[in-house]
A protein has these predicted regions:
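Conserved NAD(P)H cofactor-binding loop of Rossmann-fold oxidoreductase domains
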Residues: 26-35, 177-178
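Substrate-binding pocket helix/loop in short-chain dehydrogenase/reductase
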Residues: 36-37, 44-46, 136, 140
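Catalytic Tyr-x(3-8)-Lys segment
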Residues: 133-154
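C-terminal substrate-recognition "lid" of short-chain dehydrogenase/reductases
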Residues: 148-175
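Short beta-loop-alpha junction of Rossmann-like oxidoreductase domains
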Residues: 35, 119-129
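Conserved Rossmann-fold SDR core element
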Residues: 97, 106-121, 168-175
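Rossmann-fold cofactor-recognition segment
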Residues: 1-10
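Catalytic loop of short-chain dehydrogenase/reductase
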Residues: 45-49, 55-59, 70-108, 119-120
Length: 182
């Protein structure tokens, strides 16, 4: 794995120009802010879009990938199940999924797919008080058909699937424990 600053056009272009083509590129980096449209400052909204959408766009645009290889974007369940306090995040995720479908056409024979995770127990949530985080996970698990929140391995398996299946392109795979139907 290689870490790149997805906000740095020059670093991204320099990296891919100096690299041999990749078999697979996964773009999961982002920093977004939640909040209602009325409450989220426009500067924070623009920074979120710059990070998650335009960051993925930059990498997908510059990435050198072998024919038959893949690019996988990571969106999120809010594109399918919006929240009044996460409107922007839902819109960004929907935009990423549309970008993935369009890139599948443009970049063919490179395959492009999107994985859309639900609530996943990652370090992202470690900033919450322990009792609040555990309560949120328990409430979510109760309403999910899978009866649990996701683990990073659940998303890794989905990314591996779309990366290695030669017939998967232009698809969005939702891995949310049934959250979009619950």
């Amino acid at each position: 794995p290689t870490a790149l600053d997805i906000l740095d056009d020059a670093a991204i272009e320099t990296f891919f120009a100096a690299s041999d083509p990749f078999d697979h590129v996964v773009i999961a980096a982002s920093a977004t802010k939640g909040g209602s449209v009325a409450q989220l400052p426009l500067a924070a909204a623009k920074a979120s879009m710059e990070s998650k959408f335009w960051g993925a766009y930059r990498v997908a645009r510059a990435a050198k990938v072998v024919d038959g290889g893949s690019i996988t974007l990571v969106s999120g369940f809010l594109s399918h199940r919006p929240s009044a306090t996460s409107v922007l995040q839902g819109a960004i995720n929907a935009a990423l999924e549309a970008l993935g479908r369009g890139l599948a056409l443009e970049r063919a024979p490179v395959r492009v797919n999107t994985v859309s995770p639900g609530l996943i127990d990652t370090p992202l949530w470690r900033g919450m008080p322990d009792t609040d985080r555990k309560a949120m996970f328990a409430r979510t698990a109760e309403r999910l058909p899978a009866r649990r929140v996701g683990q990073p391995e659940d998303i890794a398996q989905a990314i591996l699937f779309v990366s290695t299946n030669p017939f998967a392109t232009g698809s969005t795979i939702t891995v949310d424990g049934g959250g979009t139907i619950a």
